[in-house]
């Protein structure tokens, strides 16, 4: 669990921003969301494979030259 200590004369909002940043870096929220409901191993593999295919096509699309405009 990430710990953020409040510095002297530091506003609470700044400490909250630091806490949110540390939570985001550790990936705690994404882990919690993924563990919120049970996902069958086959469903997890299927979801990960679909994401990999989507990333692959996105990478190919970004590497292609744009069509010529006449």
From Swiss-Prot:
One of its GO terms (cellular component) is ribonucleoprotein complex. Gene3D superfamilies: Ribosomal protein S8 (1.20.5.1150). InterPro entries: Ribosomal_bS21, Ribosomal_bS21_CS, Ribosomal_bS21_sf. One of its GO terms (biological process) is translation. The keyword 4Fe-4S does not apply. It comes from the Bacteria. One of its GO terms (molecular function) is structural constituent of ribosome. Keywords: Ribonucleoprotein, Ribosomal protein. Belongs to the bacterial ribosomal protein bS21 family. This is Small ribosomal subunit protein bS21.
């Amino acid at each position: 669990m990430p710990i953020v200590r409040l510095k002297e004369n530091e506003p609470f909002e700044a400490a909250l921003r630091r806490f949110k940043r540390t939570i985001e870096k550790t990936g705690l929220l994404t882990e919690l969301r993924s563990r919120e409901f049970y996902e069958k191993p086959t469903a997890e593999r299927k979801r990960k494979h679909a994401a990999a295919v989507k990333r692959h096509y996105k990478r190919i699309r970004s590497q292609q030259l744009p069509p010529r405009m006449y």
